[in-house]
């Protein structure tokens, strides 16, 4: 039986979140054993925030949740790919569909931002 290697990166593994239909990479976040288990049990994506030092469910504030369709691991068992149905217009906290909207072009990083919601309205604190 395969056991995921959470020790290699100090208890965390990268989680690549991908649209289950298009294959588009929506985001990359980190999981520990607890958040992976929560994800598998609830069918919603859960992560560990390194900056806020807390657990969080994708969409808990914005409503843009992710419904898990498939979970895969790589040959080293130290990374997961989670294929999801994105509920709501955007996976990124900036309001963009994907967190990967900055592209290397002609020797510089160019932002191709197309926010689908205003993060200042959604994440009022």
Curated annotation (Swiss-Prot):
It is found in: Cytoplasm. Mg(2+) binds at residues 74, 76, 78. Its cofactor is Mg(2+); Zn(2+). Its main location: cytoplasm. It catalyses: 1-(5-phospho-beta-D-ribosyl)-5'-AMP + H2O = 1-(5-phospho-beta-D-ribosyl)-5-[(5-phospho-beta-D-ribosylamino)methylideneamino]imidazole-4-carboxamide. Pathway: Amino-acid biosynthesis; L-histidine biosynthesis; L-histidine from 5-phospho-alpha-D-ribose 1-diphosphate: step 3/9. SUPFAM superfamilies: HisI-like. GO terms for biological process: L-histidine biosynthetic process. The keyword Metal-binding applies. Gene3D superfamilies: Phosphoribosyl-AMP cyclohydrolase. This is Phosphoribosyl-AMP cyclohydrolase. It comes from Geotalea uraniireducens (strain Rf4) (Geobacter uraniireducens).
